[in-house]
Curated annotation (Swiss-Prot):
Keyword Transmembrane found: no
Pfam family, one: Zn_ribbon_NrdR
Family: Belongs to the NrdR family.
Gene source species: Agathobacter rectalis (strain ATCC 33656 / DSM 3377 / JCM 17463 / KCTC 5835 / VPI 0990) (Eubacterium rectale)
Keyword entries, A-Z: ATP-binding, DNA-binding, Metal-binding, Nucleotide-binding, Repressor, Transcription, Transcription regulation, Zinc, Zinc-finger
Keyword Nucleotide-binding: yes
Lineage: Bacteria, Bacillati, Bacillota, Clostridia, Lachnospirales
Zinc finger (unnamed): 3-34
Listed name of the protein: Transcriptional repressor NrdR
Cofactor field: Zn(2+)
Length: 151
């Protein structure tokens, strides 16, 4: 593995353990040339997953899009980066556990909203407003009432 600091190939693993999600391995590495340490993660290679968009276009699954949407919904909320990462991990695990080659954005959105609803009401409403494309205040209020009725 190349060192991200000096690009040397002369690196070695100094510690290896399961990552927090137990689906990957966290490795601490040391560059023998520059002496700097860095972390890598090893994950099982998964089958390519195709996401079906609302307009029926298809594109390859991209975890960073889920992360970006959740981060935007949680912006300026008292939610740690670890909590957001765990939420994204949970959604991703559930997506891949289905063992399907294609998944719709609507299903991914519902999985995210289910978790955000339990995590933070404001983040949930923010995500839902974009995901469900609220056209006016009335649809927004209807969603708020539904959420408040379930609490």
């Amino acid at each position: 593995m190349k060192c991200p600091f000096c690009s040397s190939d002369n690196t070695r693993v100094i510690d290896s353990r399961p990552a927090d999600d137990n689906s990957s391995i966290r490795r601490r590495r040391l560059c023998d040339d520059c002496g700097k340490r860095f972390t890598t993660y090893e994950k099982v290679e998964t089958i390519p997953l195709i996401v079906i968009k609302k307009d029926n276009n298809r594109e390859q699954y991209d975890r960073s899009k889920i992360e970006k949407g959740v981060l935007l919904a949680c912006h300026k909320r008292p939610i740690s980066a670890d909590t957001i990462s765990k939420l994204v991990d949970e959604v991703e695990i559930e997506i891949f556990a289905r063992e399907e080659k294609e998944i719709s954005t609507s299903l991914i959105g519902e999985l995210i909203m289910d978790r955000l609803k339990d995590l933070d009401a404001v983040a949930y409403v923010r995500f839902a407003s974009v995901y469900r494309e609220f056209k006016d205040v009335n649809t927004f209020m209807t969603e708020l009432k539904k959420m408040l009725d379930t609490k």
